[in-house]
Amino acid sequence: VLLDVGTGSGILAIVSLMYGIKEAVGTDLDPCAVEAVRENMEVNGVNADQFEMMIGNIISDPEIQDRVGYERYDIVVANILAEVLLPLTPVVKKCLKPGGIYITSGIIAEKEQLVVDAVKAAGMEVLEVTRQNEWVSVTARR
């Protein structure tokens, strides 16, 4: 099961479903994301019962955290600004199964170390840091 935090258009979860993930959950703050996800699932032939969408703040809302679930996910993806990843990372750790993978992206190069430090502070192991021009992705394991 994959969790896409800040799902937006749903593209990360949708592509994951197209490539073999069996079930995905997406969270976003913006209610407009629901329609964007629905349209993108339809365009890409993804079955609606494979993707559950939730609107709310997973960082600060215990109800959303409970709905998302704990130790449920094999993979969590988050293409969000570093400023959001910092408080998000300890929450993600609780969502991941032991050994689960956390993939972050959308990080500007100057913020790389902040995200790496947040991942380590949450008790996760940094597996890889990928850089492309001014953008960085950090991959970690719980």
What are the roles of these predicted feature ranges?
Residues 1-58:
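Conserved SAM/SAH cofactor-binding pocket of Class I
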Residues 32-36, 84, 111:
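Conserved short alpha-helix immediately C-terminal to the canonical SAM/SAH-binding motif I
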Residues 63-75:
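A short acidic, Gly/Pro-enriched loop at the edge of an enzyme's catalytic core
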Residues 74-86:
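A short SAM/SAH-binding and catalytic strip from SAM-dependent methyltransferases
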Residues 86-98:
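A short glycine-rich, Lys/Arg-flanked "PGG" loop and its adjoining helix->strand segment in the class I
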Residues 99-106:
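Conserved beta-strand signature within the Rossmann-like core of class I S-adenosyl-L-methionine
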Residues 108-122:
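Short alpha-helix
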Residues 125-127, 131-142:
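Core SAM-dependent methyltransferase catalytic element
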